[in-house]
Amino acid sequence: MKILCFGDSNTYGYDPRSYFGGQYPAQHRWVDLLAQKMGCKVVNAGENGREIPRREGELQRFDLMLSNENPLDLLLVMLGGNDLLQGNSVEVVSQRMEAFLTRIPLEKSKIVLIGPPRMRPGAWITDDRLLEDCVRLNAAYRTVAEKLGVRFVDATDWDIDVTFDGVHYSEKGHQTFAENLYLALK
């Protein structure tokens, strides 16, 4: 089995204690922990700051990556947090996700949309609107997934431990995320 995880800094395993975008060690990243639990190859296609691809260059880059990684058994997509952090509305973000998922040339049964866990108050999260929007985004993503016939995993209530910024998972948070995602995918 081969799984491609396409996401942002939390998929990448960003360690906010490092100034230049470093990663947690593999044993503390949810992608690598999931690979161990599932006993399969899991490709980490996380990127710091990534928003939902919508520009031609971003879409071409995704298409090339997908082509290079095929055949795949599952494509896990977890994006939208950075779109919210940039001030976009839940409606805009969910429309972007729908447009992105619609163009992916895989069987819909192979696509899993993961609604991101809750953000918490922290250095990056000083506006309660973002906390509410994160929950609302999961509800909107559920609707998108049902409409498109892709699988949806809602991570809203997984109680993911985050770092001082309120956004990035701690090492404990990565462990909790991997455990919950493993159970959701079984």
Spans of model-derived segments:
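Serine-esterase "nucleophile elbow" of acetyl-processing enzymes
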Residues: 1-47, 51-55, 63-68, 175
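Alpha-helical cap/lid subdomain in secreted, periplasmic
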Residues: 28, 36-37, 60-186
